[in-house]
Amino acid sequence: MHPQQDFYDILQAVTVDCKDNGECFTVIDRVAAVERILEKTDYKLISRQPLALLYAKRPLREGDRVMLISSHIDCVYDNCFCADGGDCLRGTFDNSFTNAALLCNMVHDCLSDNVVVAFTGNEESDSQGAVQTVVALGQMGCEVASALVLDVTNEGWESGALFTLENDLGIDILTGYNIISSLEEYDGRFAFKHNALPDESWDYADYGIPSLTLCVPVGGELHGDAGVMLRKESALEYCNVLSLLASLLC
């Protein structure tokens, strides 16, 4: 389990603005927050692209087989906020929530050494951050075994799902079986949607990378400045499921 207060502190820190113009970041508050949070961890910035920050625990070498976790940091909100709403959190969480969940796993060293983390921009328009990530890893001579994309969704909110699995693209049958088997304790508490709305998994799959999206269900308009509601129970379980899926996709 991940320390609850650590997660909430990180979520508060990264629920700040981040914009791009399709070529580079133009508002970098969240970029700065990510860099600050990771300063005292084992993770090093291995590639800075105009629309992506790539982190790993060790330098990559040609021929390395890596597992990619991708969480976009761009947002469309005019005003970002994070508030406590009792059993729920309320805020502009597309996509600061998954940024925080990923950072929490990194800070507490819950991911394998062969994981590469990409904080990407431009997802809300053309996903150029994802494209730059693939190109950068290709230039390093790495093989990307799989990609786990992190995002938020309205799917599963009404049914009380803790998380959803979406857009499984190119995941082999054995890996899929292992994933479902490992989630037995969540039986009835997560939703699965094979063909969901487009996200970065589609872009990684276009490059032949087996991809899967882990989403957290929220209530409300995803891109509205009034924010969304997110169950606290979902928040902490999402962090745990993230590290579990990462270990199975490595």
PLM regions with names:
Residues M67-I69, A118, S146-L148, P210-L214:
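Hydrophobic/aromatic beta-strand patches that form the interior of the parallel beta-sheet core
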Residues D9-E62:
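A non-catalytic alpha/beta surface segment that caps or lines the substrate-entry region
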Residues K19-N21, G85-F93, F192, M229:
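A short glycine/serine-rich beta->alpha loop
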Residues K40, S47, G63-F119:
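Active-site metal-coordination/substrate-binding segment of hydrolases
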Residues L60-R61, D74-Y77, E124, E155:
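A short acidic, glycine/proline-enriched capping/turn motif at secondary-structure boundaries
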Residues S71-C75, L150-N154, P217:
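Short glycine-enriched loops at secondary-structure junctions
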Residues L89-L174, I180-S181, G188-D203:
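Acidic/histidine-rich catalytic neighborhood of metal-dependent amide-processing enzymes
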Residues W157-C250:
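Active-site-adjacent substrate-binding region
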